[in-house]
């Protein structure tokens, strides 16, 4: 009987480890943005956003509220002339609001080769709201802005 209890306990623990917490799921889904950013695949990036997402890119002058606008932003920003690209998030903090909503704030920077030289853009500040819709975590709010220089 005790061995049966141990077996059941291990089975339950194994099942629990299969299901990640909302924080880890949302962070993993958001990492896909950085992976896609390096590919110049605009459609892949847009698929990470909810159809009703609110979007402020670094160069956005107005709030973007449609997938076509988000795609247009990345078509312009990711012109394919960037050479090899690396996108690195850091200092990320996640706040779980519910089982299906997580806010992530942090910084990130991109590095690319241009004319044989490494060029770094950033670090930028970034805040996103991730929402689980069905089985997918999607970006429902995105705001990116340059990090201000410290006061002298």
Model-derived features with residue positions:
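Solvent-exposed loop/turn segments at secondary-structure junctions
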Residues: 52-55, 60-62, 109-111, 145-149
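A short, structured loop/turn motif at beta-sheet edges
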Residues: 94-102, 130-136
